[in-house]
A protein has these predicted regions:
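Loop-helix junctions at membrane interfaces
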Residues: 1-221
């Protein structure tokens, strides 16, 4: 006997029901197919960069990452991130494969899911998801992993704070740009995923992903 899939939206991910629904996505054949599509698209988009300035470029894969995480949740997102990381290296090896780097792939995907999956997707949530990834994943997690990598593979050369500063500056500069582009992208995609029955925020999707004056000021500042 088939059971009807839950379409509940949650105000936060700190509930058993939220995680029960996230795990249940693994049993949904439609989600399996969608996840395979997202992995394939993410591998392709990793090769695509959008130039902002001669020194700043946006990797287009983060659009696919956010879309997938919003649809299938944190459990699937973590698995897809791990598969994408390994396949990406197999398809296009670049130096030594250092397994801890997979944590940044998984972390970014899970953070997107925690903010966007089974939630009323708003501009604030999109901005917070991007800010959390830039700070906690790209800086606070990436830095010690880089230090570990240098200690093992760079002949004793240390990864210093000075070496991490350009990456920190880049994340600060890219945050407003990435937030705006991701909000616009999800604003287009969310009505489509709603119609396909992949997300359940029907009724407020169109108006929720608009920038208020306060949000514009925050991004500009």
């Amino acid at each position: 006997m088939s059971t009807q899939k839950s379409t509940t939206l949650y105000p936060h991910p700190f509930s058993k029901a939220y995680w029960r629904d996230a795990v249940a996505e693994l049993k949904d054949i439609h989600m399996l197919v969608f996840a395979a599509l997202m992995i394939a698209l993410r591998l392709v988009m990793k090769q695509v960069s959008i130039p902002i300035t001669p020194f700043l470029r946006i990797n287009a894969a983060y659009f696919v990452n956010a879309l997938g995480a919003m649809v299938f949740g944190p459990v699937f997102a973590a698995l897809c991130a791990a598969v994408t990381d390994v396949l990406g290296y197999i398809i296009r090896p670049d130096g030594v494969y250092f397994l801890p780097f997979i944590l940044t792939e998984i972390g970014g995907s899970v953070v997107f899911a925690l903010f966007l999956y089974r939630a009323k997707v708003t501009t604030t949530r999109v901005m917070l998801s991007r800010f959390s990834i830039n700070l906690f994943i790209n800086v606070l997690l990436q830095t010690p992993i880089m230090m570990w990598y240098y200690a093992l593979y760079m002949n004793g050369k240390q990864y210093t704070f000075t070496m991490a500063v350009p990456g920190m500056i880049k994340n600060v500069l890219m945050f407003p740009i990435e937030s705006v582009l991701l909000t616009l992208f999800l604003g287009v995609m969310l009505p489509i995923t709603n119609r396909l029955g992949l997300t359940y925020s029907v009724g407020h999707a169109k108006d929720a992903l608009k920038f208020s004056k306060k949000q514009v000021v925050t991004l500009v500042m």
